[in-house]
């Protein structure tokens, strides 16, 4: 399968989307707000509800929109990487407190987002036979579940503990559904955005 990389203009657009996404996420979800939303308001078990219902879907919108605004591959990777790096830089430079359970802004956080972005790129590439909206939804669902599994197996055991097996099916189902919805939302956002930016 031949892989065509994005051009310089598309790379800059993806980088800007990643930076804007990081700024929005940083100020929309200050310390403790995600845990409060998913556990106290929605009453969901954890750990992982915040990843599957908030962080993952937000990243999916950033990554998939960037991918759709690019003719070649690499948009999702650049946008996701910029999201993670800029988020980490702002948190460390301005000493902004974050929830240590999710290690937001740490090297583990950046590594998890990089894996997420690689999975997103692969899902978008492998789903080319599907219609565009289903391709985006497939990407969102797969990437969101992968991000959640990374947190369950690598990050949460270090910070808060292992997920209970009885809670895993519910969270995976919600994670998958939110990934599908986020992919669809990203597809919808990209259509007017691509016309406004005159990229395609």
Where are these regions (language model features)?
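Alpha-helical transmembrane segments of multipass membrane proteins
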Residues: 20, 24-28, 62-63, 83, ...
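Hydrophobic alpha-helical transmembrane segments
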Residues: 14-19, 57, 61, 74-81, ...
């Amino acid at each position: 399968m031949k892989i065509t990389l994005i051009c310089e203009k598309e790379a800059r657009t993806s980088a800007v989307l990643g930076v804007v996404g990081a700024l929005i996420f940083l100020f929309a979800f200050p310390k403790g707000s995600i845990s409060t939303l998913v556990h106290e308001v929605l009453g969901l078990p954890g750990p992982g509800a915040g990843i599957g219902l908030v962080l993952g879907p937000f990243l999916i919108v950033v990554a998939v929109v960037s991918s759709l605004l690019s003719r070649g591959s690499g948009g999702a990777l650049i946008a996701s990487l910029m999201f993670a790096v800029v988020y980490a830089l702002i948190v460390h430079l301005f000493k902004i407190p974050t929830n240590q359970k999710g290690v937001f802004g740490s090297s583990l956080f950046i590594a998890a987002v990089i894996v997420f972005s690689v999975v997103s790129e692969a899902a978008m590439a492998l789903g080319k036979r599907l219609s565009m909206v289903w391709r985006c939804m497939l990407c969102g669902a797969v990437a969101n579940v992968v991000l959640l599994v990374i947190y369950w197996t690598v990050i949460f055991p270090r910070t808060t503990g292992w997920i209970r097996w009885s809670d895993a099916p519910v969270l995976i189902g919600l994670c998958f559904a939110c990934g599908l919805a986020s992919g669809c939302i990203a597809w919808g956002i990209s259509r007017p955005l691509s016309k406004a930016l005159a990229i395609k």
